[in-house]
Each structure stands twice: as C-alpha cells, then as structure tokens.
Amino acid sequence: MHKQLHVYYSGAVQGIGFRFTAENIAGRLGVSGWVKNLHDGRVEILAEGEEESLKGLLEELSSCFSRYIRQADTQWNEPANRFKDFRIEF
C-alpha cells in the first residue's frame, strides 16, 4: 500500500552524512520525497512509497545511525503523490 512517511530525527544527526545516506537508500528502495537539515539540529524526512519500502528506509537509517539518533518522531499519512524522486533539500 502506498503511504507517506514524515519523520523528525533528533540527536547528533547533522554533519555525519545522514542526508546523503537517506538519499541513497531511498533511491535504491524506490522511495520519493526529500530530506533536509533543520536549524534546530534535527533532520526532517518527508517520503512516499510502498509501506514496506518506507519501513526499509527507517530500518536502514536506524541501523546506520543508531548511535547518533536520540529520537525519531514518525507520522504515517495518506500520500499526496507529489514527488517524482528523492532529493536533499537545502
């Protein structure tokens, strides 16, 4: 089932390659959307795709960055179908 995933990651998640890794994983899993750093030190992801692919994105990011992630605030929504690819927003 196609879903939208909105996540805010907090912890020491900036300056460690988090966004680039998210972009690579999302591309491999066929997930669209974006990832960006926030001014308060968090990283935000808004992604759409098959639910299993989105869960895979969460699991792989958690596996890669578990020592840096303090908290992941996750919300599942209905997709807006407005993304063609996954990119880093600046």
Question: Predicted regions span which residues?
Answer:
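Intrinsically disordered, low-complexity, mixed-charge
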Residues: 1-90
